[in-house]
Each structure stands twice: as structure tokens, then as C-alpha cells.
């Protein structure tokens, strides 16, 4: 079973802009956003 590797391989072929947006979105979910940058993607706002 290698689902993680399969998904990682799929992401390598994404458009760099889309991949960057996915990383930014994941970071927003992990931690609080700064007050001036807060939007619906932040969990602690």
C-alpha cells in the first residue's frame, strides 16, 4: 500500500501556481493567520 507516494507523484505534475496555492492553503489550516491577513482559510479567526 503506497497511497502517500501515489498522491505525492500526482502533485509533482501540477501547475506550479496551483501547487503553491495548495501549500499556502495547507499552511493556513495548520496555524493562525496574522490579523491583517485573516480570511476564511484561517482556522483561528
UniProtKB/Swiss-Prot annotation:
This is Conotoxin reg3.12. It comes from Conus regius. Disulfide bonds join 32-44, 33-42, 38-45. Keywords: Disulfide bond, Secreted, Toxin. GO terms for molecular function: toxin activity. Expressed by the venom duct. Its main location: secreted. Belongs to the conotoxin M superfamily. The keyword Iron does not apply. Residues 1-31 form a propeptide. Transmembrane segments: none annotated. It is found in: Secreted. GO terms for cellular component: extracellular region. The cysteine framework is III (CC-C-C-CC).
